[in-house]
């Protein structure tokens, strides 16, 4: 092999090496859902003979209206909610024959109480008197035709939390979100409430329709505690929705912040039997924040304590500035008060009593209580000794 041929082979291999070294890693496309995995409508029969097509929907990773399994599975995962309203999946477990983390039991929260009064003639009970009556209470289950399609835990009074500065106010009718939660932009959160809380006092019926409002709240010290409804502050109002499941997903939008990093808002639910003029979002509303995302700095213990006390934004600066101002005003007032009343002050009585105490005559030594019983020998009774010759 000639020299120039070797050179050509060398450069060819070098260029091939550079090409291979600079190659990009193959990007594999994401696996698509197969036909069997995609959510499809399914057919069911409701109320005896009525055919109905049910279309599942996926919201924040949660599948609603999913076709139930033919055989009930006690270990089937269910969906709970974080304090801010984010969904989380709970997987039941069996430990020593007992199911842990099982689906929630709603007890009688969604049942209707029906009372029946029976007389002695109707029952003919051997232990009833002729004039006695028996009142029986019966709990009737709700219609679960549509609520059974909801995979998320429903809100009940036993899931309420405490809100307010002293944490002594129940959160009724809300279970989520918790007060002072932070909703981030482009994230979806679930607002949940106890449906039977909205019972019309006049008719005694539970509201069949409600809608959710989001309103801005100002927290400057001057305005704090003076929350009056301001119609322009309500920036989001949902359509009237069925009050069956007691929940609604909310996706936080960037335009709600109005070019700010975070905003203080209140979440409220309006039942259909209350008009817009009579509805107050702050009566039962939950206060929270919407934000662009996590802040870079980590809040200190002092900042967390201020947040728990309800001191946010620039309120702390007002409090810090007011303390020295009050002290200065107090000393100025005391100075002028003493200056004006300088000629009217007379402390002679006080000084005279103090001087008299210092000039007090002690009296005779023998009359003092402390030495009264002490026997005092005369000087002549003291022993005397004669001097010896050596002492002389």
Swiss-Prot record:
Pfam families: Psg1
CC terms in the record's Gene Ontology section: COPI-coated vesicle membrane; endoplasmic reticulum; Golgi apparatus; Golgi lumen
PTM annotation: The precursor protein is cleaved into two polypeptide chains, PSG1-N' and PSG1-C'. The cleavage is performed in the Golgi apparatus by Ca(+)-dependent serine protease KEX2 between Arg-229 and Asp-230. PSG1-N' is highly O-mannosylated.
Annotated glycosylation sites: 34-36, 45, 49, 55, 57, 63, 65, 71, 80, 89, 99, 107-108, 112, 114-115, 117, 119, 148, 156, 171, 176, 181, 188, 192, 195, 199, 203, 215
Site note Cleavage, residues: 229-230
Signal peptide: 1-22
Topological region Lumenal: 230-317
Membrane-crossing segments per the record: 318-338
Subunit comment: Interacts with EXP1. PSG1-N' interacts with ERAD-related proteins involved in PMA1 quality control including EPS1, CDC48, UBX2 and SSM4. PSG1-C' interacts with the TLG1/2 SNARE complex proteins TLG1, TLG2 and VTI1.
Protein name: PMA1 stabilization in the Golgi protein 1
Source organism: Saccharomyces cerevisiae (strain ATCC 204508 / S288c) (Baker's yeast)
């Amino acid at each position: 092999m000639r020299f120039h041929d070797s050179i050509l082979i060398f450069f060819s291999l070098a260029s091939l090496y550079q090409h291979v070294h600079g190659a990009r890693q193959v990007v594999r496309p994401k696996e698509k859902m197969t036909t069997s995995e995609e959510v499809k409508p399914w057919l069911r029969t409701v109320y005896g003979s009525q055919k109905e097509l049910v279309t599942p929907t996926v919201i924040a990773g949660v599948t609603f209206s999913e076709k139930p399994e033919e055989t009930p599975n006690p270990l089937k995962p269910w969906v709970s909610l974080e304090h801010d309203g984010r969904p989380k999946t709970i997987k039941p477990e069996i430990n020593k024959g007992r199911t842990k983390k099982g689906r929630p039991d709603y007890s009688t929260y969604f049942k209707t109480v029906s009372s029946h009064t029976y007389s002695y003639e109707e029952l003919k009970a051997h232990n009833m008197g002729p004039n006695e009556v028996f009142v029986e209470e019966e709990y009737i289950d709700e219609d679960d035709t549509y609520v059974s399609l909801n995979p998320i835990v429903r809100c009940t009074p036993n899931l309420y939390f405490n809100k307010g500065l002293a944490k002594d106010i129940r959160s009724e009718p809300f279970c989520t979100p918790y007060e002072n939660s932070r909703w981030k932009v482009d994230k979806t959160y679930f607002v949940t409430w106890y449906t039977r809380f909205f019972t019309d006092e006049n008719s005694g019926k539970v509201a069949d329709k409600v809608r959710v409002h989001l309103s801005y709240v100002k927290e400057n010290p001057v305005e704090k505690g003076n929350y009056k409804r301001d119609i322009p502050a309500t920036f989001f109002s949902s359509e009237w929705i069925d009050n069956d499941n007691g929940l609604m997903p909310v996706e936080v939008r960037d335009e709600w912040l109005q070019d700010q990093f975070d905003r203080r808002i209140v979440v409220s639910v309006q039942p259909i039997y209350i008009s817009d003029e009579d509805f107050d979002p702050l009566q039962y509303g939950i206060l929270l924040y919407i934000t662009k995302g996590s802040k870079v700095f980590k809040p200190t213990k002092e900042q967390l304590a201020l947040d728990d006390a309800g001191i946010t934004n620039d309120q702390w600066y007002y409090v810090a500035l007011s303390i020295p101002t009050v002290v200065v005003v107090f000393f100025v007032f005391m100075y002028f008060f003493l200056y004006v009343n300088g000629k009217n002050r007379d402390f002679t009585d006080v000084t005279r009593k103090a001087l008299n105490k210092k000039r007090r005559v002690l009296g005779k030594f023998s009359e003092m209580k402390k030495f009264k019983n002490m026997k005092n020998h005369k000087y002549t009774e003291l022993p005397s000794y004669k001097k010896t010759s050596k002492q002389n």
